[in-house]
């Protein structure tokens, strides 16, 4: 089984490299899980004196369910549209984001928990800060531009994990608002995209 899995992974890497050559891609963009395929592509290009695509790799965001459920490959817990409940979909409504983040896995001591990752890689770089607003009887709103300090505040009880999740949901909703507006104004484009992705 292990050898079969390894062969399958190798085939997948070769297929992705072949796609880059076939499509004459100038810039190959993907998560860090695509690095092996991209480096293989560049090695093949060197050996054959073919044009090499420039490769850009982004951080991986964990699925909302986190890494629970036993031993996993390093990228097997990544967010993927194949499980919509485990992922943020670009046209998710504010209500859907709130529902998903409410259920999202959060290990207060793990900086790689998906809630922290979304704050670190999406919300704070885009909006400049993350706002956490508890119910009035539980305190005043706070803003955060440093995820490590935010995580420390959660561990020490200054920020409640639920309030953090709802703050992340609201921040994501703000980040995705222009996309939602675009698809609201152009529903045929959303329909076309859904037909292509099969979702």
Segments (PLM) and residue ranges:
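Short, flexible active-site loop motifs that bind/organize anionic cofactors or intermediates
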Residues: 2, 27, 87
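Single conserved hydrophobic/aromatic residue that forms the stacking wall/gate
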Residues: 1-9, 13
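Short glycine- and Lys/Arg-enriched binding-loop motifs that mark or flank ligand-binding interfaces
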Residues: 5, 26-27, 72
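Conserved nucleotide- and phosphate/pyrophosphate-binding catalytic cores
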Residues: 17, 23, 35-199
């Amino acid at each position: 089984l292990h050898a079969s899995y390894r062969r399958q992974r190798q085939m997948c890497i070769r297929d992705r490299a072949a796609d880059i050559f076939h499509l004459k891609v100038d810039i190959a963009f993907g998560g860090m899980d695509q690095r092996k395929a991209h480096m293989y592509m560049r090695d093949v290009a060197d050996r054959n004196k073919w044009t090499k695509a420039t490769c850009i790799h982004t951080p991986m965001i964990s699925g909302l369910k986190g890494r629970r459920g036993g031993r996993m490959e390093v990228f097997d817990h990544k967010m993927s549209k194949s499980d919509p409940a485990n992922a943020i979909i670009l046209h998710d409504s504010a209500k859907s984001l709130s529902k998903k983040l409410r259920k999202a896995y959060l290990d207060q001591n793990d900086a790689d928990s998906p809630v922290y990752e979304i704050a670190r890689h999406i919300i704070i770089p885009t909006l400049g800060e993350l706002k956490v607003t508890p119910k009035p009887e539980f305190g005043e709103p706070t803003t955060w531009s440093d995820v490590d300090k935010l995580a420390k505040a959660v561990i020490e009880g200054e920020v409640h994990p639920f309030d953090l999740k709802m703050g992340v949901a609201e921040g994501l909703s703000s980040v995705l608002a222009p996309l939602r507006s675009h698809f609201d104004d152009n529903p045929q484009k959303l329909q076309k995209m859904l037909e292509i992705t099969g979702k």
